Amino acid sequence: IRHLGIVGECNIQYAFNAETNDYRVIEVNARLSRSSALASKATGYPLAFVAAKIALGYTLDQIGEMGTPNSAYVAPQLDYLICKIPRWDLTKFVGVSREIGSSMKSVGEIMSIGRSFEEIIQKGLRMIGQGMHGFVGNDLHFDDLDRELSRPTDLRVFAIAEALENGYTIDRIFDLTKIDPWFLGKLKNIVDYKLKLSQYNKVEDIPADVLRQAKVLGFSDFQIARFVLDPQGNMEKENLMVRARRKELGILPAVKRINTVASEHPELTNYLYMTYAVEGYDVNYYKNEKSVVVLGSGAYRIGSSVEFDWCSVNAVQTARKLGYKSIMINYNPETVSTDYDMCDRLYFDELSFERVLLS
């Protein structure tokens, strides 16, 4: 950055060789971009606002409240993890290669927030909106696992799940994928816990600590129902059984706040997410107040893009004009609807029955 003489916002994409610690700069964007939006929403640091102030001649220590975590001079302190996953719509094209590389093939992306890698990868794979229930519990089978693991495709993560279930070691999967063993170890934790859940035949038999840990690891009620009850066909009844058992044990997600930097009223930050990994609510629910919940359209895809998101934005703006508290639930970091100053409360989380209807 110093060599290029850039003042303001800039993002750099580079390739890194973990074996030699060598890296190559692929791209430099000295402007606001989709990567900027992702970084801003992942950290709560308003890059566009700060870059505009710098362009006007302000210095970082003059933006926000100096000497506090609310100053633009202070790097954000994160107590959560973020996972970005692209959405590929490759099945909608005849003859297209499913292999992914340095050229962009995705049509959208999602961002999941949580307290562990296991949680955010499972949430993220559900958010993609292509019929997957998480890292495990999907009706996928690969005839040649070694080939699927050695080729980077949009389905390789699910090939890793099947490989772990079939007894592949982390070292063997690493040799085939070159994915860092740290990530493979976290994915193995999910598979191991799936096997633990499968030991129970009734929802009532699952101990409270086992069920709670399953939720901490990102398992949905749907996944737990599939592993414990092994239902066929319509799973609505079994899903509700797990939900009822979980609520009976008092296992509910906590609502946590992401503090934004350089905001005028940090204590009023409305940028929220849900997790089972901790207890306690950073905000209280709106009670006895008129409020409207708007469900976003999720990741961009072929046939649903920014025009649908703008419908959500118009909905929350209209609700506010009519005197209602506006609540947005969405998880697309590219969109205007997930800007935390567009509504009274933004829940950056899954658009699912389990998350939208907590009680």
Enumerate the predicted regions with their spans.
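Extended, domain-scale alpha-helical bundle/helix-rich regions
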Residues: 213-217, 223-233
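ATP-dependent carboxylate activation and anion-phosphoryl transfer catalytic cores
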Residues: 1-210, 214-218, 236-238, 248-257, ...
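Glycine/threonine-rich flexible loop motifs
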Residues: 301-311
